[in-house]
């Protein structure tokens, strides 16, 4: 009987260690306590409270398993331990949770089977009686520690306290000494706020580039907790930071002082479906020439908000032009101030004097935003790249359609089986996307006047190439990153794991293309990276794999001329610092901002 009890206790402790990486268990306990505290006392958003509770489930199960092991080792029958077994199986059976495991799922399954067998034998050999062992001290310590962390975190506006930062490298490299590149000549859309501060891709050409100085390593890192992913960050004419942050169920607008991260005002402005890969409802928004926020709310309504108090000042209902169950993905104005919008099921519309008019692109899904030039709009669907134009007060007219290789499947890291890029315009002739070809993705460059494909350049390792983010256009260079492996979203980068490495560049000059460089070590799970002509840097956000299980995220600079990594600086550790498809941004003062699952992180100059 003694051997049976010791075997059961050992197996229960083994389950506690194997079902979630021990380092991740600690990280999630601190993250969960922090998010719960901020949800209760700071942002006061119900589903943020739910997120905090979610992070705490597996740490709580681990504590209960150890508590059960102590009981089984003494005199308990093991019924409570048996009840815990379905929770232990969760990480092995649920794909979203598998990356949290310390071992392969089959190993945990075998341990659970053995544990259940021992517990059943123990229950059968132990008579029913009132147990007199005292093991509740462990649960009491857990509860006291959790309560203390909840209260302490609830009193601050920063990300949750995370003690594992000390086990991550601080960074590498130093400030660059390279010369500046020629300043960008990107057209200013007169209906939008000033470039490059008006949208997720900086301008209506979606160049993702700046002519601003970037911070150097060694600067201070600040954070602001919002409880949601702040995918798009803009700056108005007063220099204030304007953003929409999406929790699982809500979209909350923020007006923030970028120098202090003090929240000037905030307000819930919409709702969204609980999805990790659906960006409709507020993932994309644009700041117009009057400093107003324009975004597609759920239900097919284009909402216009004042950036003074985040109250609605105008709206356009375009739901009648959408297919059943279709949501608007993104909205941008053209040079005449007309709102263009795209829907997830292939609708492209424009709001003219007679209201919204639209056409449907054969039901082809549209998962990303679009680009707007003076004389046309460029949209990529799941099957083709389009140029469209407005015709009077009628629906948009298709100017040309260029099919691309959409591949055979949705690759890990993508939100759909198709191109993951918003079209990028450059120079006075080009438009670029990536395809989804198997086994190797290509950068596809077309003549934006005719749609003729000028070149297709394969990038990254065969069988491990995909991107879900727009190309960067800077000087004569197009920069692309590899996001292959960011699946399941969020948990794929837990427990020291990360995605496939890769960043590459091609030159595109006078209608001809050639590979420029390829970096096979930088790891960018999902950031919308940016570049600046000042010292010629790509500014990105990396998460290299680690052997100790600490999930460290880094602000990173890469030389746009050579592809060499110039410097990195630790942003922080844990899931709060996961940007999850959000972008990087430079402020007018040279601060580097990144939207994350918990809010905003910034590297100061």
Where are these regions (language model features)?
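Structural motif
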Residues: 248-257, 299-306, 345-352, 383-389, ...
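Blade-level signature of beta-propeller repeat domains, shared across WD40, Kelch, NHL, RCC1
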Residues: 578-605
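Loop/turn-rich, solvent-exposed surfaces of beta-rich toroidal or solenoidal domains
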Residues: 245, 430-433, 469-575
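Surface-exposed loop and turn segments in beta-propeller and other repeat-based domains
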Residues: 267-277, 317-324, 397-416, 456-464, ...
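Short beta-strand elements that form the blades of beta-propeller/WD-repeat-like
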Residues: 236-246, 291-297, 303, 337-342, ...
